[in-house]
Amino acid sequence: MKILFMGTPDFALFSLKALVEYSRANESVEICGVITQPDKPKGRGYTLLPPPVKVFALESGLPVYQPETLKDEAFAELLTALSPDLIAVVAYGKILPKSVIDFPKYGCINVHGSLLPEYRGAAPMQRAIIDGKKKTGITIMYMAEGLDTGDMLLRRELEIGENDNFECIHDGL
């Protein structure tokens, strides 16, 4: 099975690392590529820095692609060339167009840092803390058109302690 991984920040690394380990132990699984956001300027000096997913993927010998858009002919051609059976999406940072969601034979699976349907979209862990929630979690689901919609496959809860911060929740998920 050919899997295309799409992710950008540290949160996506846990899943990518697990997928790399699994693919190395199972010849029937191949990571055909990693799609991540383009390098962005950061800090006071606006130094161009790569996303954490790009750094790890390159260190792991995986092909990395950083398209500006998922809606042009160039990306459609890349998708056709990679021909993934499944796309795994973890905190990629852009909404996937229907053409991408519908492309792989087994669909797209998303890992989201909240107990959906609560906190769809960006910064779900931070929003749970701001709202004073006592628990949050992670949801794995098949993707559908729309923001964090689709059939849920798995949900796991995580208690938010009185002194927990973003880092505690991030690492706990």
State where each predicted segment sits.
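N-terminal Rossmann-like dinucleotide-binding module
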Residues: 1-44
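Internal alpha/beta domain cores that form substrate/cofactor-binding pockets in large enzymes
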Residues: 2-4, 31-35, 60-82, 87-89, ...
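Solvent-exposed polar/charged
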Residues: 21, 58, 80-81, 102, ...
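Positions that flank functional sites
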Residues: 39, 72, 144
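N-terminal beta-loop-helix "entrance" segment that forms/cooperates
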Residues: 40-60
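Donor/substrate-binding cores of folate-linked one-carbon enzymes
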Residues: 86-173
